[in-house]
Amino acid sequence: MVHKIEISIDVIVHATEDMSKILQSFEDVLDVKREDFAIEETEGHYENPIILLNAKIVKKQAQNFMNKLLESLSKEQVNELIDEIAERTIDSRFHVRLDKQELIKGNLAIREKDTIQLKIHTPVYNKKDTVKIFTEIFQIAN
């Protein structure tokens, strides 16, 4: 069964990081283009410059993103995500964080620090179906 998927991508780029490398890595690894991102310049707590990158992808592009994501993660990492569906899902949104430095190297890895935040949304009308629906999504490419 194909599910309607919408994906939000949020990245904080610090002054010491090269935004163009990060954007190029998204295109190379996950096929998300520079023009898909909204770019906002702001300041951190100590007035340090930071850039917020945000993208929202839908329909066929979101399906392609999921396929690339699941193909790039190890089978163990995908199984770990499946095991953690209940803990990672809030209001039909599955939350996962990817290592920003690994993406720049052309790899994907699940991490909790200095990360790229992904929110994968699909309509779940009955909360008890959440695990089943997200398991189906993750097993498409597994």
Q: For each predicted feature, which ranges?
A:
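Mid-chain, well-packed structural core segment of small domains
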Residues: 68-101
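Short glycine-/aliphatic-rich beta-strand segments at the starts of folded cytosolic domains
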Residues: 7-12, 53, 90-94, 116-120
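Glycine-rich, aromatic-bearing surface loops/beta-hairpins
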Residues: 95-142
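Short, conserved charged micro-motifs
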Residues: 17-21, 61-68, 105, 127-131
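Long, hydrophobic N-terminal alpha-helical segment
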Residues: 1-36
